């Protein structure tokens, strides 16, 4: 999959940047970064999932370190979404859905969200869990894992746990004429494939 197609899929499938309210103007852009991997580069093996029943799960399920900065004005909470748009034959796999992250929280340490935490409300991933669930990429071409942080004007405790990605997005963008609760988004992409 070309990098152009990945970016287009991320924007279209996530419906975050285009469909939500424009990011509030700021001197510095809203940013998402990681010390575990560089944007557009391979992620280390340890971030892959561990499942003895799936030979493609070859890691330790250690969540990557994530930091975000320069949140838009009016932000009350954050959400983090992780998706593999190439997973399940192009149908996509939602590896992590987390929301209700207080505005005072601007990072997660490496491994911190591999388990439930009081710092976020766990949604429901494709795997049916609320915490980070790492890649189980088959051999061949690396998959592009998209990480998106969403700044919202929602109170951190406003949403119930267990929302799927689609349910969360529906809460974020209610039917017109109601305004979107998104204040802006930032993202990065990590690559992974099962080593030979």
Feature map (PLM): residue ranges:
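Bacterial N-terminal signal peptides that target proteins for export
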Residues: 1-12
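N-terminus-centered regions that define maturation/targeting leaders and the start
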Residues: 25-196
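Bacterial N-terminal signal peptides
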Residues: 10-21
